[in-house]
């Protein structure tokens, strides 16, 4: 018996369902969040990405895109400390075939963006799951995939439902919110 918005093991969901409902091409992006992030998490993330992925582009203040081969965590901290938030800093890197962009908006919210159009096959989906699983393990924290800008903090104060991500990764455990499945009749 399934409750509305119940998280289910990813193994119980077909690639076709993932493609249609999680990676639906609707003009919006999907966000990857590490909620309640700390600067220590950001440092771990930067080290993890620098070791495992190739940085495609890194943009600092003034809007000038520069090519660097690694994320400079000290520069991130400097921008957070001097500006309160690093609005003009982002890094682009590839996870397999998927371009990922990370924005350094706030030091307490680690966010990556991806275009769901780029998740073109089950094999490419697995590349993303590998990234999310390894990141969750490196941080020892839950990593979630959501609709664009969908975090608990972004919800209206009048909304009283339970917030659930599209997909949740906690270590090696991956769960999907199978919102398209009808709840069991009571």
Ranges and model annotations:
Residues 1-79:
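Long, contiguous N-terminal structural blocks used for assembly/anchoring
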Residues 1-9, 114-186:
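Acidic, proline/glycine-rich low-complexity IDRs
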Residues 14, 28, 41-44, 79, ...:
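Residues in intrinsically disordered, low-complexity segments of regulatory proteins
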Residues 17, 31, 44-47, 82, ...:
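Intrinsic disorder/low-complexity segments enriched in polar/charged and small flexible residues
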Residues 24-26, 106, 137:
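Solvent-exposed loop and beta-edge segments used for protein-protein assembly and interaction
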Residues 30, 108-110, 139-143:
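Generic beta-strand structural signal
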Residues 37-40, 96, 107, 117-119, ...:
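Generic structural motif
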Residues 55-108, 112-114:
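Short, intrinsically disordered low-complexity segments
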């Amino acid at each position: 018996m399934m409750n509305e918005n119940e998280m289910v093991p990813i193994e119980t969901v077909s690639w076709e369902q993932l493609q249609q409902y999680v990676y639906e091409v609707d003009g919006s992006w999907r966000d990857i969040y590490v909620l309640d992030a700390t600067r220590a998490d950001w440092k771990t993330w930067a080290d993890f990405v620098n070791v495992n992925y190739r940085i495609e582009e890194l943009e600092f203040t003034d809007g000038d895109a520069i090519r660097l081969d690694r994320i400079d965590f000290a520069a991130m901290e400097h921008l957070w400390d001097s500006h309160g938030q690093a609005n003009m800093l982002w890094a682009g890197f590839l996870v397999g075939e998927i371009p990922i962009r990370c924005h350094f908006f706030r030091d307490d919210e680690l966010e990556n963006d991806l275009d769901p159009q780029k998740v073109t096959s089950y094999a490419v989906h697995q590349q993303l799951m590998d990234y999310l699983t390894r990141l969750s393990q490196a941080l020892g924290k839950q990593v979630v995939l959501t609709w664009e800008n969908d975090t608990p903090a972004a919800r209206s104060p009048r909304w009283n439902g339970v917030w659930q991500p599209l997909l949740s990764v906690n270590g090696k455990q991956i769960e999907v919110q199978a919102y398209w499945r009808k709840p069991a009749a009571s």
